């Protein structure tokens, strides 16, 4: 481990030295640009654009562009980027991740690479985790960009298509990650090119990059339409699983959070639902509902995984502790939780388009990110996104004191100790930020502080709209703030008057998160910009992380320490190391899961790209889609004729071919069965192809002009493609759910999924050809298809 650390540090040092030389070139312009008038400085923007047009690269103009943005920031914002911020800016421009500690001015750092890359006119997206930050940064930094002659757009969920298009057409666009992804999906569902809002994805700088590209990497963005109702099954499955006994009827594997029925549970299910064999193929819908009811009742925990508010089940984000409005668990899990909690069960949805953040952000020509904590995940960033993580030095040294963890045998003992610590610090007036992992523990601690008469503020999913305001005041004398899982990222905690003398902000962690990165984020709230500060984590053997990983080894260590009393405490670096190794195991598991998800997603990604590319060709066509349409019809004719004319001519099934022709191409009164007799396979194909050509000419004549014919062709193709793609997404989802079971048959589930998925895709393409043929040939033309 020490070797790996040394390698990190040395490679970072070399990289910082290289970047430092480029920063020197930027700083050379400092005095010269300070002497320019406002008009002269602003004139740099068109000059730099002209140089790009004349063939210069972005790297060629970087020193002048960075120096221009830097001097502009000094005049407009009253902020002058430090040398370390210039280095951070170069890291971003090169498509990597700048790891910069809290309070080091990431927002200002980004202004230089944003300005430089916006000069190309291809668009730069600045991506934030919520709309509050997008709006704040677009407003504040927008002043600088506008002053320098660039346009700035803000893309919000509430905007209509025209407003969104305007925002995306700006040089610089601020948006949340989810809005970018949903706009991309919606753009690939439109019928007319003019309805699209985005330009091609050029360069994105992702703020809090670890939160978006790692914590939310597997979150699928889903656009869905209604599907069939199965409310009754959810309620029956829920009632049934509530009668089961742990261990006897079902088993839970906590590290993987999976649950399954035992033999006894299977027998009970068969008896309860009156079945001979629960796992018979016709019972798949029922087994699916039972599986989800088991997960809902015994794995999904209220106020940790989800919360109930106003009769609605809301998902709680495990990394921010916020309620995720409008998000629903897919595949019926949300309905199963609704049945468990006895609230109204909402209809299941059918997915019409979906993509994960991993695959969405990999579509940008260049991607960069910034965060206070990414080094622990650098392997993942390199392997999946091809981005290096560079630790940018702080402007002033960090003087915060990080104490070793303290460990208590029970939760009660731990929380009592936390309250005592808070009481002692509160008497001095030292401000405190107390981090909890779940809403449940923040409410428990809040109750204990009420009993101890210590005034405090709680920040969790239930009151996140006041978040920024609460966090901004957390550094004032006497402030006690409880926050779930580092809600409030992106908002600085500045120390109030007299707080430095009291030791700065004290951060108290009431539990270790399963990711070291989240713990580091909590620590990083204290000691910003060289301020004093301290951090202390309190743990207990009953913590979730301890229960799932590593408690046995730690218990054995406690025996060595001879801990008898429940309130006895141990503070030891050895404990901290054991906890870290437990966290590394969880992180390893999580990374493997994300990598595995990505391998499955890549199958869908390739298919999505094919479909979306074909859709784009159809939408962008200005003259005629006849070549595309007739190719589809001719492929169908060839395939159908070949199917019915195999082997010797006496074995051909011309009756079946005639039935297909009259059902799909032409009315029986216009075509006689005898017309198929005495022809070779090629002649039959030629006959039907000619029939299709005649039909095309008739429709063209009926419509009377090319523009109307083009509209008709577009409607036919897009209607069929969209319907087939929606069904295919659904089928691929079901395949993915079932494929895991094949692992037991000595087969590699991923290979099976790839092969089966490819076969299903081929079948879908063939069915698109079939449906387009039938729809086009059989359609009755009514006048005026103009939109």
UniProtKB/Swiss-Prot annotation:
Binding of ATP, residues: 85, 103-107, 492
So what does this thing catalyse?
ATP + H2O + cellular proteinSide 1 = ADP + phosphate + cellular proteinSide 2
Say yes or no: keyword Membrane present: yes
One GO process term, biological-process aspect: intracellular protein transmembrane transport
Q: Which GO terms describe its molecular function?
A: ATP binding; protein-exporting ATPase activity
Q: What is the protein's major site of localization?
A: membrane
Keywords (A to Z) from UniProt: ATP-binding, Cell membrane, Cytoplasm, Membrane, Nucleotide-binding, Protein transport, Translocase, Translocation, Transport
What InterPro entries does the record tag this protein with?
A: Helicase_ATP-bd, Helicase_C-like, P-loop_NTPase, SecA, SecA_CS, SecA_DEAD, SecA_motor_DEAD, SecA_preprotein_X-link_dom
Q: Where in the cell is it found?
A: Cell membrane; Cytoplasm
Enzyme class, first EC level, given as a word: translocase
What start-end ranges are recorded for coiled-coil regions in this protein?
none
Q: What binding partners and quaternary form does the record give?
A: Monomer and homodimer. Part of the essential Sec protein translocation apparatus which comprises SecA, SecYEG and auxiliary proteins SecDF. Other proteins may also be involved.
Entry function = Part of the Sec protein translocase complex. Interacts with the SecYEG preprotein conducting channel. Has a central role in coupling the hydrolysis of ATP to the transfer of proteins into and across the cell membrane, serving as an ATP-driven molecular motor driving the stepwise translocation of polypeptide chains across the membrane.
Which NCBIfam families would you find in this protein's record? PRK09200.1, PRK12904.1, secA
Q: Which family does it belong to?
A: Belongs to the SecA family.
Put simply, this protein is called Protein translocase subunit SecA
Organism the protein comes from: Lacticaseibacillus paracasei (strain ATCC 334 / BCRC 17002 / CCUG 31169 / CIP 107868 / KCTC 3260 / NRRL B-441)
- Gene name? secA
């Amino acid at each position: 481990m020490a070797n790996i650390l040394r390698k990190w540090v040395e490679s970072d040092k070399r990289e910082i030295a290289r970047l430092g030389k480029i920063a020197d070139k930027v700083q050379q312009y400092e005095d010269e640009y300070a002497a320019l008038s406002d008009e002269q400085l602003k004139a740099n923007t068109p000059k730099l654009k002209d140089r790009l047009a004349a063939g210069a690269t972005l790297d060629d103009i970087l020193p002048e562009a960075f120096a221009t943005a830097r001097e502009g920031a000094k005049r407009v914002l009253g902020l002058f980027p430090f040398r370390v911020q210039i280095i951070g800016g170069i890291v971003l421009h090169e498509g990597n991740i700048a790891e910069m500690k809290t309070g080091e001015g990431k927002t200002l750092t980004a202004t230089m690479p944003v300005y430089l890359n916006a000069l190309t006119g291809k668009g730069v997206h600045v991506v934030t985790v919520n709309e509050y930050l997008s709006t704040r940064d677009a407003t504040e930094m927008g002043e600088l960009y506008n002053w320098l002659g660039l346009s700035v757009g803000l893309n919000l969920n509430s905007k209509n298509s025209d407003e969104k298009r305007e925002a995306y057409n700006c040089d610089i666009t601020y948006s949340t990650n989810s809005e970018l992804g949903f706009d991309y999906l919606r753009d690939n569902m439109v019928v007319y090119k003019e309805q699209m809002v985005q330009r091609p994805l050029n360069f994105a700088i992702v703020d809090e990059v670890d939160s978006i590209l790692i914590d939310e990497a597997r979150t699928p963005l889903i656009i869905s339409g209604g599907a069939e109702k199965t409310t009754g099954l959810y309620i029956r499955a829920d009632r049934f699983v509530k009668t089961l006994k742990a261990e006897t009827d079902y088993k839970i594997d906590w590290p993987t959070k999976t649950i399954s029925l035992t033999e006894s549970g299977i027998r009970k299910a068969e008896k309860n639902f009156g079945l001979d064999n629960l796992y018979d193929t016709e019972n798949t819908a029922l087994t699916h509902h039972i599986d989800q009811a088991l997960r809902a009742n015994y794995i999904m925990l209220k106020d940790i995984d989800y919360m109930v508010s106003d009769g609605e089940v809301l998902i709680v984000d495990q990394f921010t502790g916020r309620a995720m409005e409008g998000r629903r668990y897919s595949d019926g899990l949300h309905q199963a939780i609704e049945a468990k909690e006895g609230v109204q069960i909402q209809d299941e949805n059918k997915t019409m388009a979906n993509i994960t953040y991993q695959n969405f952000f990999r579509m940008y020509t260049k991607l960069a990110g910034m965060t206070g904590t990414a080094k622990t995940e650098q392997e993942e960033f390199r392997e999946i996104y091809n981005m290096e993580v560079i630790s940018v030095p702080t402007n002033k040294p960090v003087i915060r004191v990080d104490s070793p963890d303290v460990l208590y045998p029970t939760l009660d003992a731990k929380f009592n100790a936390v309250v005592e610590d808070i009481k002692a610090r509160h008497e001095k007036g030292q401000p405190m930020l107390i981090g909890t992992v779940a809403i449940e523990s923040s409410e428990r601690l809040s109750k204990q502080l009420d009993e101890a008469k210590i005034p405090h503020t709680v920040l969790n999913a239930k009151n996140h709209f006041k978040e920024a305001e609460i966090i901004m005041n957390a550094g004032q004398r006497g402030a006690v703030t409880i926050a779930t899982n580092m809600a409030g990222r992106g908002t600085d905690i500045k120390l109030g008057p007299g707080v430095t003398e009291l030791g700065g902000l004290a951060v108290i962690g009431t539990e270790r998160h399963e990711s070291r990165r989240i713990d580091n984020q909590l620590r990083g709230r204290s000691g910003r910009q060289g301020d004093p500060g301290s951090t202390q984590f309190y743990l207990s053997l009953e913590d979730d992380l301890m229960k799932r990983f590593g408690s046995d080894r730690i218990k054995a260590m406690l025996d060595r320490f001879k801990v008898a009393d429940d309130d006895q405490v141990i503070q030891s670096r050895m404990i901290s190391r054991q906890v870290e190794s437990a966290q590394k195991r969880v992180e390893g598991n999580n990374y493997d899961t994300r990598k595995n998800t990505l391998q499955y997603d890549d199958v869908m990604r390739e298919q999505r790209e094919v479909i979306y590319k074909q859709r784009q060709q159809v939408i962008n066509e200005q003259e005629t889609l006849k070549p595309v349409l007739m190719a589809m019809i001719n492929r169908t004719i060839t395939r159908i004729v070949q199917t019915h004319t195999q082997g010797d001519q006496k074995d051909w099934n011309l009756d079946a071919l005639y039935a297909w022709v009259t059902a799909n191409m032409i009315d029986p009164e216009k075509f006689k069965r005898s017309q198929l007799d005495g022809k070779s396979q090629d002649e039959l194909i030629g006959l039907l192809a000619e029939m299709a050509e005649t039909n095309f000419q008739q429709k063209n004549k009926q419509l009377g002009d090319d523009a109307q014919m083009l509209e008709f062709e577009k409607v036919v193709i897009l209607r069929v493609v969209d319907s087939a793609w929606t069904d295919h997404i659904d089928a691929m989802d079901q395949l993915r759910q079932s494929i895991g079971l094949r692992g037991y048959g000595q087969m590699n589930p991923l290979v099976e999924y790839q092969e089966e998925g490819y076969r299903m895709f081929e079948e879908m393409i063939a069915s698109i050809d079939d449906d387009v043929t039938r729809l086009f040939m059989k359609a009755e033309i009514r006048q005026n298809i103009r939109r």
